[in-house]
Structure formats: structure tokens, C-alpha cells
Amino acid sequence: MSGRTVPHAHPATAEYEFANPSRLGEQRFGEGLLPEEILTPTLYHGYYVRPRAARAGEGGRAGASELRLSEGKFQAFLDVSHFTPDEVTVRTVDNLLEVSARHPQRLDRHGFVSREFCRTYVLPADVDPWRVRAALSHDGILNLEAPRGGRHLDTEVNEVYISLLPAPPDPEEEEEVARVEP
């Protein structure tokens, strides 16, 4: 018995899977629930939450996001299959990479739905925001990529000088000065 160990990831350890996730799944916003998802409760054992059943035809990828950092490049994959290419916007603001998408109300298999999301990634310090490239695959996976190892971008800090204003004159002192001056 002493030779067996039970794997356990405590939140205070580096192995804790949810402390810094590289994948974000189960983001099927605005879609209906299947009957088995309503009747089957979510299992909770310690730090494990069972994901909802994968829908037929979607392969469990809808709405998923994956982030990869390697020696040579920064990569992010985001499922935007519910949106047309014209409805997706990618931009960088300082060291932030922002992906947003929005579509107006349209008919789907459950009724009418409109969707909107915004996801922001923090770029590593050695990634130039001007070199980020985006490509959309035929199945709706957005590939965001930028080379690493370039120049280290310094954060611009503007320190504002604080000038000291003179104290306002005391009204009592002004009266004394006025009395002294005949």
C-alpha cells in the first residue's frame, strides 16, 4: 500500500491545472440544452467538474480557446464558427490582443439568436504587437500568431511632476497686515 500514490493537485501547487489554463472550453453561449444535460447533474469531486456532453456534429470544439507559448512564437486558437469573417475583429492595444465578434439576430435550429463576445489576451513582453497575424480556417478556427524573441518592448511610464502650490493667505494675517500699514 505504501508504494501507491494518489495524484492530487492542490491549488497552491504549480501542477494545479486550473491556475493557468491553456484551454478554455464549454463556451456554448446562447445554445439550447439537451434533455440529458438537464437531467444529469454535474459531478463535483474535489477540483474536477465534469464538462457537459459534447453535442453531435460539433466534436466538443465549439467556443473553445487554446493558447500556446513556445520559444519561437505566441499562438492562440479561437473557435469563431458562429460568426462570418466580416463579423470578427482583431486588434492590438499596447500589449493586449483583443478579438471581438458580433452578429445580429438570426434564425438557428432553436429560434432566434444574436451573439457577441470579446476576448483579450496579454501578449508576452518579447512579442511586437505590430507583428500579430490572424488567419481563419474553413471550419471557423481563428489562428492568431506572432513571433517571439524579438525586441523587448519597454512599458512606457510617464511620471508626472507634482508641483507644490503656495498655501492660500490666511484672512486673519491679511487683517493684521492691513492694520499695521497706516
Curated annotation (Swiss-Prot):
Its main location: cytoplasm. The keyword Nucleotide-binding does not apply. GO terms for cellular component: cytoplasm; nucleus. The keyword Cytoplasm applies. GO terms for biological process: negative regulation of apoptotic process; protein refolding; response to heat; somatic muscle development. Keywords: Cytoplasm, Nucleus, Stress response. It is found in: Cytoplasm; Nucleus. Disulfide bonds: none annotated. It comes from the Eukaryota. InterPro entries: A-crystallin/Hsp20_dom (IPR002068), Alpha-crystallin/sHSP_animal (IPR001436), Alpha-crystallin_N (IPR003090), HSP20-like_chaperone (IPR008978). Residues 55-163 form the sHSP domain. GO terms for molecular function: structural constituent of eye lens; unfolded protein binding. May regulate the kinase DMPK. Belongs to the small heat shock protein (HSP20) family. Interacts with DMPK; may enhance its kinase activity. This is Heat shock protein beta-2.
